[in-house]
C-alpha cells in the first residue's frame, strides 16, 4: 500500500506529541549498499511547512523519502514526530505516496478509501472530497488493475492527504496529472499545510512555488 501500516491501537499505541516537530533531520550522508549517494544539511520541519527536495536525477531524493517513511535504513538521527522512522508511532504520523503507488487488487478505488479511513479511525469524508476534486467520482467503483497509472496515483493521493496526518511524503506527485488535477492537488496541499500538516515533496517543476516551500538540496557524495 502507498500508505504506512495501520496506526497502532490499544496498549501498543503511542501518539505523536504535537509539541514535537513533524520531522528532524541531522546532517546526513545517504548510502545505498554501503556506497555514499548524497549528503544533505540537517533541518527541522515545523507544522505547516512544505519542504521541496531538490537535486539531480539519481542523487537520492526517493531514497531519502523511503528512509523517512521507514522503508529503508540509513536515517541515523532522523526523527519523525520525535520517533525513529519505521517505529509504530512514526508510522502512525506519516503518509507516503511513491511515484507508482500500488493499490490492493481486491478493493475498488472507493472501497480502498473507505478501508483506509476505517483502518486509521479517521472520517472518510476528507478522502472522498479530495477524490472528487481530483475527478475520481466516476472511477470509485472500478478495480485498481483497470485504472490508468495516473488515476491510481490520484486514489493514493486522496487517501494520503485525506488522512490529515502530521507528515506527508510525496514523490513526484504532479508527474501523471493533468492541469485541473494539478491545481486541485496543489490546493489540497495548501490546505493541509494551513491546517498544520508538514509535507516533504519531490518535483522537477515549479508547481510548489505558490506554497513558498523551504528547499533542501541533496548534493552528490
How would you describe each model-predicted region?
Residues 69:
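Helix-to-loop junction immediately C-terminal to a conserved catalytic motif
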Residues 73-92:
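Conserved ABC transporter NBD signature motif
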Residues 100, 105-121:
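Q-loop/switch helix immediately C-terminal to the Walker
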Residues 114, 124-140:
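Conserved ABC ATPase "signature" region
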Residues 143-150:
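Conserved ABC ATPase signature
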Amino acid at each position: 500500500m502507498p500508505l504506512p501500516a495501520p496506526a497502532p491501537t490499544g496498549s501498543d499505541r503511542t501518539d505523536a506529541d504535537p509539541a514535537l516537530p513533524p520531522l528532524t533531520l541531522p546532517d546526513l550522508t545517504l548510502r545505498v549498499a554501503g556506497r555514499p549517494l548524497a549528503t544533505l544539511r540537517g533541518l527541522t520541519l515545523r507544522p505547516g511547512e512544505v519542504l521541496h527536495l531538490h537535486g539531480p536525477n539519481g542523487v537520492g531524493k526517493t531514497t531519502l523519502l523511503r528512509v523517512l517513511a521507514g522503508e529503508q535504513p540509513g536515517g541515523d538521527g532522523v526523527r519523525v514526530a520525535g520517533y525513529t522512522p519505521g517505529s509504530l508511532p512514526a508510522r502512525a504520523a506519516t503518509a507516503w505516496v511513491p511515484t507508482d503507488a500500488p493499490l490492493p487488487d481486491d478493493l475498488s478505488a472507493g472501497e480502498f478509501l473507505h478501508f483506509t479511513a476505517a483502518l486509521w479511525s479517521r472520517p472518510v469524508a476528507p478522502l472522498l472530497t479530495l477524490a472528487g476534486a481530483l475527478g475520481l467520482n466516476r472511477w470509485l467503483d472500478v478495480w485498481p488493475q483497470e485504472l490508468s497509472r495516473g488515476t491510481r496515483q490520484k486514489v493514493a493521493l486522496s487517501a494520503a492527504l485525506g488522512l490529515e496526518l502530521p507528515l506527508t511524503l510525496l514523490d513526484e506527485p504532479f508527474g501523471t496529472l493533468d492541469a485541473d488535477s494539478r491545481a486541485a492537488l496543489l490546493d489540497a496541499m495548501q490546505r493541509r499545510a494551513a491546517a498544520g500538516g508538514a509535507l516533504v515533496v519531490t518535483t522537477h517543476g515549479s508547481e510548489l512555488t505558490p506554497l513558498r516551500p523551504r528547499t533542501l538540496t541533496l548534493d552528490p557524495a
